C-alpha cells in the first residue's frame, strides 16, 4: 500500500512534466515514457524500501543441523580454483556428512587431478564423474543421478565458502516448511581488488543483489536460487525434472519450484565469495546470459501459471523489466545528454525523485550488511571509486547489454556460456 501510495503521489507530482512532454510526443506516449524511467522503477524501489524496513534485524541462525548433504560441482577447465574451493569445503563447521560430486564437463586441463589431490590431502569424500556433452545443466543432471541425501548444494568451482556457510544454509532449509524447496546463499565478490569493473560489481553484489534477494525472501519468493551457491531439497529438484536445457538453468529451475507450489528463500548469513568478470567482454557475456535466462523462465513458466499470489506477483514484475531496460537505454541515457544542452523534457529534476529512495535503500542495507558480516568476522575494505561507478555508470552499461541479451533469445542466437 505504501508503494502504491508513492506511485500515486509521483504520478500527481509529474503532471507538469507530462504536460510539457506531451506537447512533443502526445499524452499516451508521454505516460509510457515516464512510466519506464520513473513510475515503474519508483514503485519497485518504494516496495523494496518498505519491505526492508518491515523486516527483522539481522541475526545469525542458531540451529546446528547434521543432515547429510551432497555438493554438486560442475567444472570445465577449473584447475586454477578447484583446489582452494575444496579446501574451503574441508574447513566447514558442519556436523553432518558432506559428500562432494565433481562432474568434469570436458576439461582439457588438470582440473580432475587437482581435485583428487586436494580431496586426498584434506580427507574429503569426493566422487568424480565425467559428462562429455557440453552444458552446465548436463553436468548437474549427471551428478543428480548419484545424489542420495535429503539436501543438495550446487557450488561453482571458483566459489569459496565462509566456514559457517553450509551450516547456516542447511539450518535455513531445515527450519523452513516442506514447501520451501530451495534457499539461495549470499554471494560477495572474491576478486574485489581487481579491475574497476570488479570493484563496481563488489558494490552491486553487496547492495543491489543482496537487497533484491532479501526483499523477495521476506515473501519466500526469491526469484533465483543461483547455481553458484544454493541448497535444495533433493526430491524437489528431481520432481522438477532436474536442471533444464537453458542458458539460465538456475532461474528456470527456481520458477519450476513456484509452478510446483514451492517457495524459495534467501539466507544472508550463508556467505560465499565468487569471482566476477574483470574484463568488459566477459561481463557482457555474463549479463547477456542472465537476461536470456530471465526470458527463458518467462517463456517456460509463465507467471499466470503460478498459483501462489506472491510468487506470481514477483515473477510478473519481470515482465516489465525489459521495458524498463528499453526506456533506460533509449530515453534515460539520451535524456542525460540533452540535459547538457538545456532540454529537460526527458530527464530533469522530476526524474531524480527515484534516486533518493534508491540511496536510502542502499544506506539501510549497508548498515544491515555491516552488522551481519561483522558478526561473521568479515571486514572488506571497499572501493569508493567503485561505489561511484556503481551508482552513476554501471546501469548505463548493463541496460543496453540486457537488451541485446533479450534480442539474442528472441532471435534464438547461439548460446555462449563463457
PLM feature spans:
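Membrane-embedded multi-pass helical conduit in multi-pass membrane proteins
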Residues: 11-42, 48-53, 63, 321-411
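N-terminal signal-anchor transmembrane helix
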Residues: 21-33, 42-97
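Long helical/loop segments within the catalytic core of UDP-sugar-dependent glycosyltransferases
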Residues: 50, 122-123, 132, 137-139, ...
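Acidic helix N-cap motif at the loop->helix transition within catalytic regions
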Residues: 83-84, 109-118, 140, 164
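Short beta-strand/loop segment that forms part of the nucleotide-sugar
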Residues: 97-106, 129
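A conserved acidic beta->alpha catalytic loop
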Residues: 104-112, 133-134
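Short aromatic/hydrophobic "clamp" motif used to bind/position activated sugar donors
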Residues: 152
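Catalytic donor-sugar/metal-binding loop of nucleotide-sugar-dependent glycosyltransferases
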Residues: 245, 254-272
